[in-house]
Amino acid sequence: MPIELILRWQGRPTGCGRAEILDQLSVLTPTYRLTPGPRQAWDATYLDTVDWRLRKRGLVLRHLAGSLVLDGEGGPWRTELPGEPQWPALAGALAPGEVRDQVERAMWVRAIAPKLRSSEVSREVTVLDAEGCAVAEVEWAESAGVEPVQTAPLTRVTVRAPRKRDAERIARILLAGDQFQSGEGTVYDALLTASGLPERRTRPAITADMPADAAIATALLGFADAIEANVAGTVEDVDTEFLHELRVAVRRTRSLLKIAGDMLPGAPPKGFKWVGALTTPTRDLDVYLLRFDELARRSTVGELGDLEPFRQHLRWERARERRALVRGLQSKKFRKLLDGWSAALREVAGGSGVTAAELAGERLHLVADDVLRHAAAITPASTAEDVHTLRKRCKELRYSLEVFRPLCAPEPYRKVVKNLKRLQDVLGAFQDGEVQSAHLRLYAERMLRRGDPPAATLLAMGELLARFVEQQQHARHSLGSALDKFLGAGTREQLAALLPAAQWAS
């Protein structure tokens, strides 16, 4: 592997003109002879998911003319494209090859789309020693952002040499002047910084002495921002996670209004319950379709394709439900709700006589006590509705903890959330088995009304139903031990240690 040293050129861009580059590298000519290669120019489109999943994993994906190029540890990888790609794109829509194999796991269920487009030029200069032997290559590259904003060209000079001493000697000569500096990071990083990306839209952190009404309004504005940020992706069906994150923000809003909405002036809006109901059918179908291949592989009888008519029916149902979802999200009712709510929150005066710390002590105590009381009441004879109620209370505690996290002691917070998540996982498995069983029966009835599905499909669906019932029974069996662990003295001690004693309501 050749040695690479990265430098930054601080002078005016050269456009990679032959004479201009040779002039800037002239400090090397007393020792070396320089032979410039041809000038190359291209456009690059950098791709990532909306939440920057590739970048977080050290991957840089570019669409160049006719190919996808991925840089990262162990790379680069390149896949030639059969035609012009369409963005956004899920992993399954990418051309088969090394690039898709590498990014599929990082992308998860999210789609990639252009983050920025750049115009790039480069020229390689061969460095020869006194005997005429090539000892290094100097690549002079200039990159300018084109979209979403135009940026001035950034010049990156890369010294490559088989031997470390040659690379270091050339770099040392260049760095002796005042126009070169040591560089680090990638071209992509530099372009992102110059373009003001990634955007970081964050609300002020909640502090202990903040008025309670201002603290709650701040948290709710953050949730409103999250709802707004996911509307377009949901309407355009970019990927299923946009709808999921929109729903999470709605649930957080409703939970916080229930827990601390009395701190705000006026009656809380009731429209978020409507948004929850509007988005539920499509999300339920998304979950089914995302898990479909896994469910099909569980089948122990029949053929793998027996469930394909069921998949097609789910897609038909989803298309129908999505039409209603899109109408709702594009309606005046939804826009009035979101705009009016955000405006009202921005007008909260912050005149409460109660501090955020005092409110946290009071409400976390109430919500935690409610969870512990419901958890202690669960027995083997408890109804599914009782278990579902406990799950809802656990979510409310989880959201409350997230809101007041800046005020909590870090270690007790970590332990409380860990214990709570463990219980939520069991409760979720129980409810998923119940809900999916009910939905499966409903989908089977609708398939029969729409036509005459193959007997093999109905038999395979029957096996799925049995597995959902088995999942629910297994979760019910696991629930007892999960509750015992959660109700132990450790959880109560950790809850008590979340906040200073003076803040914890008695």
Where would I find each of the regions flagged by the language model?
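Function-determining surface determinants
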Residues: 1-506
